[in-house]
Curated annotation (Swiss-Prot):
Region ATP synthase subunit delta, annotated ranges: 169-446
Protein keywords: ATP synthesis, Cell membrane, CF(0), Hydrogen ion transport, Ion transport, Membrane, Multifunctional enzyme, Transmembrane, Transmembrane helix, Transport
Gene Ontology MF terms: proton-transporting ATP synthase activity, rotational mechanism
Species this protein is from: Mycobacterium avium (strain 104)
This protein's encoding gene: atpFH
Protein name (database record): ATP synthase subunit b-delta
Signal peptide: none
InterPro entries (alphabetical): ATP_synth_B-like_membr_sf (IPR028987), ATP_synth_b/b'su_bac/chlpt (IPR002146), ATP_synth_F0_bsu_bac (IPR005864), ATP_synth_OSCP/delta_N_sf (IPR026015), ATPase_OSCP/dsu (IPR000711)
Amino acid sequence: MSTFIGQLVGFAAIVFLVVRYVVPPVRRLMAARQEAVRQQLQDAAAAADRLTESTTAHSKAVEAAKAESKRVVDEAQADAKRITEQLAAQAGLEAERIKSQGSRQVDLLRTQLTRQLRLELGHEAVRQAGELVRNYVADPAQQSATVDRFLDDLDAMAPAAADVQYPLMTKMRSSSRVALVNLTERFTTVAKDLDNKALSALSSELVSVAQMLDREIVVTRYLTVPAEDAGPRVRLIERLLSGKVGDVTLEVLRAAVSERWSANSDLIDALEHLSRQALLEVAERENKVDEVEEQLFRFSRILDVQPRLAILLGDYAVPVEGRVGLLRKVLDSASITVNPIVAALLTQTVELLRGRPAEEAVQFLAEVAVARRGEVVAQVSAAADLSGAQRSRLTEVLSRIYGHPVSVQLQIDTELLGGLLIAVADEVIDGTLASRLAAAEAQLPD
């Protein structure tokens, strides 16, 4: 019995403990769980409501999208139809424009091709003509015949004489021309009483005075003042040069400054001219005039074909002594013996270039040498050497044309093909076959 009571008390204690300490937490836990389940049920109900709402909204959006897409498609179809019509209209206009422009381009291209074809045919015709001419004149007899035909044409020009003035005169105005004539007459009177040595000394002193006047511009300007009384000019030249040059030179200088000169440089030109005349007088007395003329023209042609040498001789950055030294080296290396008078004339020319190109100054010197004998210089270029008869006929015809004896200076240029090229002073007569071919080519259309 006591055991039962003990068990009952133990059971009661256990029940008390369970009710006291276990049941409250379990109740709270169950209540919390129930609350959580209830909240979940509420959330599920809300989610179901939202799902229903979203489904409804989705359906509405789908319907609206279908309606909008149908509207956009309808508008796009309308726009596409309108654009298609516009493009079709523009394409028609563009096609007409392209067709018109293409037609113009075709016409322009046809014109250009026609012009180019004509030009090519023209050049080919000229080239073929040139070949025919070259083959024709390859025969020396036929080439000589071209010269004879040109001389026939030139002979027909003989009645029409041309007025050709001598060198230096063409550069001066009337007052200086008169002064040069008077001074030359005075020089001739003085020179006839001098021997060759005195003439050479006179030439050298005149060149020295000309160089001095070229440097002293103020003195030259005073000596050429166009005053009626020449006394002051004569006294000045005497004070400057008395005792420094010979009496003959001083006499010539007195005569020079007594004249009226149109330009300051004309006095220097006149002194240079007289210095050349003195040396040419020596050549004439020694019967060396032809040799002097030939060598001067030969040196002139050398400068024409060797422009580098002409540039060096006229390089004013180099002292005159250096340029004269170069000239002497060239003359010493010549294949022929250079006449001393030619060397002196060329040296004086280099010393008194005064801004002129060397090749022009030497050519002018050669013309002065020929003009001393009253001859006119004719520079003649031919494709081959002339026969004696042709040279004589050419000289005779040119002498009749210009009314003066003519000195023919011949130069060979095979590029001329045939005929002759004649230059007298500033007048040029071109009767070469090469010039005719060039003229034919120049007349071709561009």
